[in-house]
Amino acid sequence: AIKWTCDGSPEFTIEEVDKADRGSDIILYIDDDCKEFLEEARVSELLKKYCSFLPVPIAFGKKKEWKDGKQVETTEDNIINDTTPLWTRKPSELSDEDYKSFYTKLYPMSDEPLFWIHLNVDYPFHLTGILYFPKVKSNIELNKNKIQLYCNQVYVTDSVEGIVPDFLTLLHGVIDSPDIPLNVSRSYLQSDSNVKKISTYITKKVSDRLQSIFKNDRKQF
């Protein structure tokens, strides 16, 4: 096996070692000012935020169960993520209840959405996602930053200005695309050709859905 070692500087060492079992072991050493990342609750919080929909299973400790009035660990791995979230599946496989349940999972304290749009395009850019029209009772509930941006099912941010048009940022839901550049300024983002195409596509899908409801269900509209 190969052992890679680094102390945090640009330099590192690589050496051959004996290893009895298959797989990779990653050992991290935490500085004193970062000890919060050794706390189970903190690690669980970060995994839940960024890795809830990672495409590979993540085991974090063992499952627990109540026994004799207290929680005890079992021998079963505690898988903390959903590897096939709704937006990665075909709309034909999903029911209205599936969409509503997923919305409740994302926004536990919200009322059921009015309706939703399932996004799925592979060319000329890759984009998947689900956008929900929330039930809004007052202006106070018109909160932005409710659309979550993912890249290959890894959470990135809930600030999608420059990607989703401003007049649509009141929607809720998820968009996932590996074609959106990360860690760049908003002005650069708005000038990116793929981002422009994605923004136009989302606007058209929302417009088409609203137009369809207007024609076929005027009362709901």
Task: Report each predicted region and the residues it spans.
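Short acidic (Asp/Glu) and glycine-rich catalytic loops that position anionic groups and cofactors
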Residues: 3-6, 23-29, 77-84, 146-152, ...
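Short loop/turn segments at secondary-structure transitions that flank enzyme active sites
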Residues: 32, 137-139, 181
